């Protein structure tokens, strides 16, 4: 911290000879007050003398602090063009007092809510409203953060003897200060001070004459560039008295850009591995404009400079290399530029000479050498822990598209090729290896990316969703496509980064294998991975075709689309419907994963928010059609509940969901029971038979588009379906770790027991239902020989038929039955059992038995439009066969039904289900999505947030069937 140059000297000169560390400041002779010509001038420190001799035209002031402060913050003030000695003479207009003052105040790096910002303040005029002491001939303007000891003072401003005066100023303060985001501690004090005096002698310290406050939070939101008057007041017997006014010309608070070259030169944040106090407290000129090759030459890597940089880098130690890890960005920029191919030449490699290929191999060799230097160990965690070793990351919101250019082989290859630049946050070696893989795929598979070079029109804010937490190159794609449609297969997934390698295959392959062999939670470096129901989606990113289709629908911020049709295209049924709708230019978005569903709904919510911000009237509800199975609707429901939990309740009316069933769909069956027109549209035999086939029909047997659009255009009534909560307690994949919980909303059916083995809707405690959006239960998978005849139609009710239909599944992990304990509590309506007996509704009820299946439904009874606040449970238990002599049998013995007993319990508000044996793990199907490795689960009839209903559109004027 620099001490103030002593205008007026006194004992110790500036600050009285404080032992404060930092750069000293010289005081120009022009600033000496004429009243004290006899006092000796403070000698200039040796280090400062060099700086003073190089620029004799500028004088300096300093940022001062109390003598007790030990902060290592730095401040430098430069004053120029000050008034002539003796002040303004008679008849002469005084020149404005010009000073430029700079300071950098320390920032609490341990707090995530404290960020550095740059504050700029320009003062134009000082007006004294009250006559001060007669011997007051000079004042000082100082700035200070409330609660801080750091003070930045100007040079002394000479006041004429007339008393009430106006002094023209050209005073600029530039401060890098700590801004606290979560507490009201951003008050900047503008103080009018004078030197302390004792018996007509100047002594150490300053006396504050008046103070004015500036709220930095308001300045950050509303910068001011016009004339602004700040009143300075003093307290006399607890009464505020105006003393002076300061006219402010400009006032702003800006974030500090750590990405620019200038910030790279002047960023004094210490490296994690090389922290030193000396580095922090010195504003070294070696870092600013230095010719030292360690600081200056790695900023840009053009082709002719690359060889020189390589030779110099090979001489560096690993310690110095670690401190400059961000330069890998520029290295990749240069490498990608070398592969830049013009459109006229094409994407062939015929024009590339062997010498150029050898040079590229040399460059890659050098790059991997540097990567090994940054990560000398092959063990897993270090690679993620040093993801940002330049400085502590500052809190910020990441846009959805951030990182896509590093990881998508199809969406952003065009921008990499044309711009030759990378996105942000590409310093981790894992992402660098992914980039290498993208580049090699681009060289070998050019035809795959010819059509993917268009610029996206959707902005970053449109795609800001939950899926943006981690975007990395997927190692494997989990969206099996059964159709050969080019528009769906050509960009089905980012899987095409797998395959070929560059000539550096020997070195790149082991690195890739090391990364992919680690657990997924370590590769994504996310502590929430174990608890996220969409863990597997961290390895996926939405395809470019999804954004293109969104661009055609979300045309303008001024208007919202009337309807959007989401189609699950992971099976032939969805592809078939999507192709028919696209042929007639309907607003269709084809999705293959939960990430894409989230991207579409997030963009839609963002557009609704923009519309509400720009219009006083409420928007009409946007109709969102979900064309797919029950598991597809479940993915939409999960995002809807999670996104709207942080919004106000009026957002619940901005969207209306339309359910178009493809295959088994309990929710659709219930909707058909309360809406006859809906039932005749989607639940008749023609629709059911069409989508129960194993392959698409050759010709269109019925008007699919007509039925869908009839529903989309005619659904004017909103039916609210209650949202229930399922809490799954899952076994951790590591034996020594504790179990963890997942909270999943549902509106349909939860099953446990002999659920059908559907790999398309599998999810477990370690992996989310990535493919829970895929094959519905009507289409048998290609790798399974299970009989699906019992599930070709939707279940008749939340009743026995659906439960009994799954009894004969040969691949069930439980065999024929499973021992369960079901504890349940009854709600207000009470319990109605088929046997007719009654129980105490206030106590817990327990069922312990050997079950064939347990099924819990949140849907109301068929035909009942009025919603209930409870659930219904259907259990199928195994009964022992009674040994009866055949002589007494008058009829042929019944077959398998004699072994099973069905029981329906209604009015349940809460339920807990667990296996009798503690080591037995359950498989639970929630709205068609299967979760495994479940220790036990709990169901509640109501979701805990204000999102308690799911709005579904039905035909107007419909009557229950």
UniProtKB/Swiss-Prot annotation:
Pfam families: C2_PACS_N, Pacs-1. GO terms for molecular function: transmembrane transporter binding. Keywords: Acetylation, Coiled coil, Golgi apparatus, Phosphoprotein. It comes from the Eukaryota. Residues 404-426 have a biased composition (Polar residues). It is found in: Golgi apparatus, trans-Golgi network. The keyword Coiled coil applies. Associates with AP-1 and AP-3 but not with AP-2 complexes. Interacts with FURIN. Forms a ternary complex with furin and AP-1. Interacts with PKD2 (via acidic region). Interacts with SORL1. Interacts with WDR37. Coat protein that is involved in the localization of trans-Golgi network (TGN) membrane proteins that contain acidic cluster sorting motifs. Controls the endosome-to-Golgi trafficking of furin and mannose-6-phosphate receptor by connecting the acidic-cluster-containing cytoplasmic domain of these molecules with the adapter-protein complex-1 (AP-1) of endosomal clathrin-coated membrane pits. Required for normal ER Ca2+ handling in lymphocytes. Together with WDR37, it plays an essential role in lymphocyte development, quiescence and survival. This is Phosphofurin acidic cluster sorting protein 1. It comes from Rattus norvegicus (Rat). The gene is Pacs1.
